[in-house]
C-alpha cells in the first residue's frame, strides 16, 4: 500500500484530501502544527513545522506521494491590505519541502498552485496562455510570483528525473471545512456565512457584486489529485483544474439563498475594495491526459456545503 502524506492536513483542502484518501487504498499521513488535528483512525498525524527542514525531512521519510496542501491563505481583505503575508513563509516552506522530497527521492510530488497569475480574459484560459512578460494584477503581484517561483522549483527538480511533479492551478475551491470566518474567508465562505447567519434577511456585499469567479467543489479537486497519482506519466505537468464556468458574486449569493430556502435582500457597499478579475479555466488538458471532468454541479455543491455548515458550525 502506497504511503501518501498530506502537508497542511488541518487546512481546508488538506482536510478534504485526508478524508477522501482515507477511504481509498492508501496509507494516509497528515501534518499539523498550530491547529489541532481532527480524529480519524485511518489517518496518522505528524506534528511538523514546515519551515523547519529537519522536521520536514523526518515527516517525508519513506513516503511515496507528497501533497503540498499547506499555505498561508486568506481572503480579499488581506490580499489588498497585507499582501506580504502570503509571500515570505510560503516561499520558504515550498523551497524546503521540494528540496526534501528531491533528496529523499519521493516518487511523486503534488503542488497546489492557483490561478492568480492569469490575466483576465473573455475566453477560457489554457495553461500555456500565461505570459510571464505581461503585467500581473497589482493586488496579486506578490502572491502570484510566489506561486510561479514555486512552480519553477518543481520544474527545476523534475529535470533530474528523480521524481515526478504535478502542479495544480485550481480555481476558487469551496465546500466542507472551508474558512467561514469573515475576516479570513474567500468569497464563497464569506457569502454563505452572511446568508446563513442573517437575522434580518439582508446581507451586504462588497462592491457591486459583478465580480465573477470560477467555482469548483472540493471533492472534484480531490478526484483530480487521485487521477494525477494514477495516470500522470511525464516528470512535470501543469494542469488547470476548475469548472470552466463563471458566476458573479451577486448571483452566487442568490443561489446560496435559494438553496438555503432564505429570502435575502442584497445591499452593496461601494466603499469596500474588491478585486476585479475574470478568469475562467479551460481544463481540456486534464480531461485529455487524465480523463478528469467536473462531476458536481454548483447547485449540488452549494446544497452539500449548506448541510455540512448547519451540522458543524451553526
Language model feature labels by segment:
Residues 4-24:
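N-terminal Rossmann NAD(P)H-binding glycine-rich loop of SDR-like oxidoreductase domains
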Residues 31-35, 50:
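N-terminal Rossmann-fold cofactor-binding loop
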Residues 42-52:
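Rossmann-fold cofactor-recognition segment
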Residues 50-89:
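NAD(P)H-binding glycine-rich loop region in Rossmannoid oxidoreductase-like domains
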Residues 68, 95-140:
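Conserved Rossmann-fold NAD(P)-dependent oxidoreductase catalytic core, especially the SDR/UDP-sugar
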Residues 121-124, 128-130, 143, 155-230, ...:
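NAD(P)-dependent short-chain dehydrogenase/reductase
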Residues 142-149:
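Active-site helix of classical SDR
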Residues 197-314:
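C-terminal substrate-binding subdomain of Rossmann-fold SDR/epimerase-dehydratase oxidoreductases
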Amino acid at each position: 500500500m502506497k504511503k501518501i502524506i498530506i502537508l497542511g492536513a488541518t487546512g481546508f483542502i488538506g482536510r478534504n484530501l485526508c478524508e477522501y484518501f482515507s477511504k481509498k487504498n492508501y496509507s494516509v499521513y497528515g501534518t499539523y502544527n498550530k491547529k489541532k488535528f481532527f480524529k480519524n483512525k485511518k489517518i496518522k498525524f505528524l506534528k511538523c513545522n514546515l519551515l523547519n527542514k529537519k522536521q520536514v525531512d523526518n515527516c517525508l521519510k519513506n513516503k511515496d506521494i507528497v501533497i503540498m496542501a499547506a499555505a498561508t491563505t486568506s481572503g480579499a481583505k488581506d490580499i489588498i491590505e497585507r499582501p506580504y503575508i502570503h509571500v515570505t513563509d510560503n516561499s520558504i516552506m515550498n523551497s524546503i519541502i521540494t528540496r526534501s522530497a528531491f533528496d529523499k527521492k519521493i516518487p511523486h510530488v503534488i503542488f497546489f498552485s492557483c490561478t492568480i497569475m492569469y490575466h483576465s480574459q473573455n475566453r477560457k484560459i489554457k495553461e500555456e496562455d500565461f505570459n510571464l512578460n505581461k503585467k500581473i494584477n497589482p493586488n496579486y503581484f506578490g502572491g502570484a510570483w510566489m506561486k510561479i517561483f514555486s512552480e519553477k522549483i518543481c520544474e527545476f527538480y523534475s529535470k533530474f528525473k528523480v521524481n515526478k511533479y504535478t502542479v495544480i492551478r485550481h480555481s476558487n475551491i469551496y465546500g466542507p471545512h472551508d474558512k467561514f470566518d469573515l475576516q479570513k474567508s474567500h468569497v464563497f465562505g464569506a457569502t454563505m456565512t452572511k446568508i446563513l447567519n442573517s437575522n434580518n434577511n439582508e446581507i451586504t456585499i462588497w462592491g457591486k457584486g459583478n465580480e465573477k469567479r470560477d467555482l469548483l467543489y472540493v471533492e472534484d479537486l480531490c478526484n483530480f489529485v487521485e487521477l494525477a497519482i494514477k495516470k500522470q506519466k511525464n516528470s512535470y505537468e501543469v494542469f488547470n483544474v476548475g469548472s470552466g464556468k463563471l458566476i458573479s458574486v451577486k448571483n452566487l449569493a442568490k443561489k446560496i439563498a435559494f438553496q438555503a430556502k432564505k429570502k435575502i435582500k442584497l445591499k452593496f457597499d461601494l466603499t469596500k475594495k474588491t478585486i476585479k478579475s475574470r478568469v475562467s479555466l479551460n481544463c481540456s488538458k486534464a480531461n485529455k491526459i487524465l480523463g478528469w471532468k467536473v462531476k458536481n454541479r454548483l447547485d449540488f455543491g452549494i446544497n452539500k456545503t449548506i448541510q455540512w455548515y448547519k451540522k458543524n458550525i451553526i
